[in-house]
């Protein structure tokens, strides 16, 4: 019984680490999404003949405004899909963690109850 509980505790810790990693990844992607949304807003607000630059490697190069906007919209769409995927993984892991916590709690209660009944 104790070995099974130890395995479940180890599994719980592993799931919690995975959840933490997914949450961190999701936060990074959401930050990138906000930056892209700000850039798209700025592109919408500037005059069409305003010079636009984009970063390529360590350089800033002049680029076509519409082309930059299209690239940003594509990137935004990709990031939104990745965030949705991570959200699904996050929910699935949260459910697994919750189920495992319930099983662990039940196993510990049975262990305590079994020990008390044997002593009586």
Swiss-Prot record:
Its main location: cytoplasm. Keywords: Chaperone, Cytoplasm. Heterohexamer of two alpha and four beta subunits. The gene is pfdB. It holds the Pfam family Prefoldin_2. GO terms for molecular function: protein-folding chaperone binding; unfolded protein binding. Belongs to the prefoldin subunit beta family. The keyword Transcription does not apply. It is found in: Cytoplasm. Gene3D superfamilies: 1.10.287.370. This is Prefoldin subunit beta. Molecular chaperone capable of stabilizing a range of proteins. Seems to fulfill an ATP-independent, HSP70-like function in archaeal de novo protein folding. Transmembrane segments: none annotated. One of its GO terms (biological process) is chaperone-mediated protein complex assembly.
């Amino acid at each position: 019984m104790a070995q099974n509980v130890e395995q479940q505790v180890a599994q719980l810790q592993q799931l919690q680490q995975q959840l933490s990693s997914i949450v961190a990844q999701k936060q990074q992607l959401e930050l990138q999404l906000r930056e892209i949304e700000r850039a798209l807003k700025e592109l919408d607000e500037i005059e069409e003949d305003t010079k636009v630059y984009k970063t390529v490697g360590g350089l800033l190069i002049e680029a076509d405004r519409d082309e930059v906007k299209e690239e940003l919209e594509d990137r935004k769409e990709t990031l939104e899909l990745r965030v949705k995927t991570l959200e699904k993984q996050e929910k699935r892991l949260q459910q697994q963690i919750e189920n495992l916590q319930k099983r662990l709690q039940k196993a510990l209660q049975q262990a305590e109850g079994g020990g008390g009944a044997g002593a009586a």
